[in-house]
Amino acid sequence: MADIPHAVLSERFQECMAGRRLVAGVFLTFRFDPAFFEQEVLPVFLDIPLSHATTIKLVQLEDALRSLPHRVAVYYDQNGIVPEAGPAKLDVERLAVRHRAIFHPKNIFLLVEEEEANDGERKQALLVACMSANLTRSGW
């Protein structure tokens, strides 16, 4: 039987992002904590130096999001907002999925490109993660 990979999610994603920069991102989750996503998850994919002061960090993240060629979006179950979640403060597309069933995926789709251009072009790749982690402190 194949070994199931074990790793700290943020560290594994940082390894995958090495030498690349984010072009666009789509996150699918059942449970969602907007403040945790903005403060702890999103910085992993932007790879910029950030202040430890929350208000300054938010400004830095907003500037980084504005510089992306495309948007970042989070799709979550309409009933999946964590009750103790902090409010969203960044310009991230947040889309509550409403239907009769439960929206329960936990996937990440990242369009990335090489940081360094080769002959004026940057190769792009789609990074896909299928996992069991919600975008919450306890899930991540």
Question: Where do the model's predicted regions map?
Answer:
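PLD/PLD-like phosphodiesterase catalytic module centered on the HKD motif
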Residues: 1-140
